[in-house]
Swiss-Prot record:
This is Regulator of G-protein signaling 9-binding protein. Specifically interacts with isoform RGS9-1 of RGS9. Component of the RGS9-1-Gbeta5 complex composed of RGS9-1, Gbeta5 (GNB5) and RGS9BP. It is a single-pass type IV membrane protein. Residues 1-210 are cytoplasmic. Residues 232-235 are extracellular. Belongs to the RGS7BP/RGS9BP family. GO terms for biological process: detection of light stimulus involved in visual perception; G protein-coupled receptor signaling pathway; negative regulation of signal transduction. Its main location: membrane. The keyword Coiled coil applies.
């Protein structure tokens, strides 16, 4: 029961962190807006809530001295996956903080990154400035407050990582994977039967008969070329 609960929490954290990563990549671009910043705020807060719940659940289980060896190995794998996910979340939050400070919404004089928007410069600039001025006051307070809150949350995530390492000592290099690299590509959950067959065919070894036929064909081709050169010289 505890294992399934931890897996569900970790799966939700992975999806939320991936969503946050894609949103961070658009900060400072032509799609940047107050709606994007608000969505970033909601997503990172959801990720932190899931991280706190996952950390508390895994910590309680791994600190149980009566845990069986096979169960402990499974929870240690979940712990390593959770630790890596938290590292990625912290890195994306720091990136969002840097980009948010470099491209503030409350300072329209600082142009955003151009990502393919085209048109007459005077008309585009006039429309952009008029639209910006209408929302300047509404966006200014949110932008500044969100950056301050994000800075505090980055420190909190860093403290969470430090506390994790102090409470539970699970070196990443001691945890062994249960599946070989790329084994998920053959899973019937993520791929249909036809995809599995094609992957198996492409992943199989070289057929000796085909290799021999290719060698013979190459030899015949070289002989034909040599014969053609000789005939050309004699003529």
């Amino acid at each position: 029961m505890a294992r399934e609960e931890c897996k569900a929490l970790l799966d939700g954290l992975n999806k939320t962190t991936a969503c946050y990563h894609h949103l961070v990549l658009t900060v400072g671009g032509s799609a940047d807006s107050q709606n994007l910043r608000q969505e970033l705020q909601k997503t990172r807060q959801k990720a932190q809530e899931l991280a706190v719940s996952t950390c508390a659940r895994l910590t309680a289980v791994l600190r149980d001295r009566g845990l069986a060896a096979d169960e402990r190995a499974e929870f240690e794998r979940l712990w390593v996956a959770f630790s890596g996910c938290l590292d990625l979340l912290e890195a994306d939050m720091r990136r969002a903080l840097e980009l948010g400070a470099a491209f503030p919404l409350h300072a329209p004089r600082r142009p955003l990154v151009r990502t393919g928007v085209a048109g007459a410069s005077s008309g585009v600039a006039a429309r952009a400035l008029s639209t910006r001025s209408l929302r300047l006051e509404a966006e200014g307070d949110f932008d500044v407050a969100d950056l301050r809150e994000l800075e505090r949350e980055v420190l909190q995530v860093g403290e969470m990582i430090d506390n994790m390492e102090m409470k539970v000592n699970v070196p990443r290099w001691t945890v062994q994977a249960r599946q070989a690299a790329g084994a998920e590509l053959l899973s019937t959950v993520s791929a249909g039967p036809s995809s599995v067959v094609s992957l198996q065919e492409r992943g199989g070894g070289c057929d000796p008969r085909k290799a021999l036929a290719a060698i013979l064909f190459g030899a015949v081709l070289l002989a034909a070329v040599a014969l053609a050169v000789c005939v050309a010289k004699l003529s």
